[in-house]
Amino acid sequence: MKSADRFSPVKMEDAFANSLPTTPSLEVPVLTVSPADTSLQTKNVVAQTKPEEKKPAKKRKSWGQELPVPKTNLPPRKRAKTEDEKEQRRIERVLRNRAAAQTSRERKRLEMEKLESEKIDMEQQNQFLLQRLAQMEAENNRLSQQVAQLSAEVRGSRHSTPTSSSPASVSPTLTPTLFKQEGDEVPLDRIPFPTPSVTDYSPTLKPSSLAESPDLTQHPAVSVGGLEGDESALTLFDLGASIKHEPTHDLTAPLSDDDFRRLFNGDSSLESDSSLLEDGFAFDVLDSGDLSAFPFDSMVDFDTEPVTLEDLEQTNGLSDSASCKAASLQPSHGASTSRCDGQGIAAGSA
């Protein structure tokens, strides 16, 4: 039944009809071709050809794989021809590459260790510099605060200082007690001037000069009235010393202007001394040897009568040995003659 159905004449006709070419339709054929259709077709063609042209990638062998022992012992410079020799060259190449890689890794390790040590040193140095920077910043801030504080104190002191300040309050040396004003002048009669002693102006009137020049041959003695002797002569200087102790003369009386002029302006005092010592006293200028012709206004009065040693002993109260020694003493060289003998020399030179 089934075979009969399969080969039935109706079905045979349908199959034959399907196999016959169909007649073309009456539609207008398309004369242009779309570029999109052609591009898609080319992409498909390229995609289909690529898998065929791609070669399988060479698989890398794992690291540390054990190499087989070479079967041949080919010299290094000889070219490998057989498969065993090529395998030997491959094994040698792998061993050389492994040794070079090990050397490179060791060199890199040393370089990394060196870089690590340098990095640690630089980090420590950087940390130290950061600490120093912090300290310097703190010090700078402290100094800035001090400067600001001192500036404020200076400005405050300038504002607090009075504008009108007298020189006496600033300097104690300019006080009115040291420098008086013009209206505070003291009259001269109220100023206590010290009265100088006669011994300050004439060293021959000092008692200490009686024991300083024992030499009798250097300066000859000048006697009053032209008298010379061992006991009857008395020098002008000794007269001044003897009169010093007389209570009748007022030694504390103030000196006159002429006395000061003769004391401080005696230009020829040394010359008169030398002329007196060389030529002696000129008594011929006196009227018959009268000493009253001298206009004495000093504190020393001369007497024309000769004075003996007995009178000196009674006046001064000296012993015999002291009186003899005082009579033979001479004034020292260059002694001042401004009072007792200066006027006599001046009169003699006139």
UniProtKB/Swiss-Prot annotation:
SMART domains named in the record: BRLZ (SM00338)
Superkingdom of origin organism: Eukaryota
Region feature Leucine-zipper, mapped onto this chain: 143-150
Start-end of Low complexity biased regions: 160-175
Gene Ontology CC annotations of this record: nucleus
Swiss-Prot/TrEMBL keywords: Activator, DNA-binding, Nucleus, Transcription, Transcription regulation, Unfolded protein response
Induction section of the entry: By the unfolded protein response pathway. Accumulation of unfolded proteins in the ER leads to splicing of the hacA precursor mRNA to produce the mature form.
A single BP term in Gene Ontology: response to unfolded protein
Cell compartment(s), UniProt: Nucleus
Complex and partners: Homodimer.
Family: Belongs to the bZIP family.
Free-text function comment from the UniProt entry: Transcriptional activator involved in the unfolded protein response (UPR) pathway. Recognizes and binds to the UPR element (UPRE) in the promoter of UPR-regulated genes. Increases the synthesis of endoplasmic reticulum-resident proteins required for protein folding as well as components of the secretory pathway.
Protein name in UniProt: Transcriptional activator hacA
Source organism of the structure: Emericella nidulans (strain FGSC A4 / ATCC 38163 / CBS 112.46 / NRRL 194 / M139)
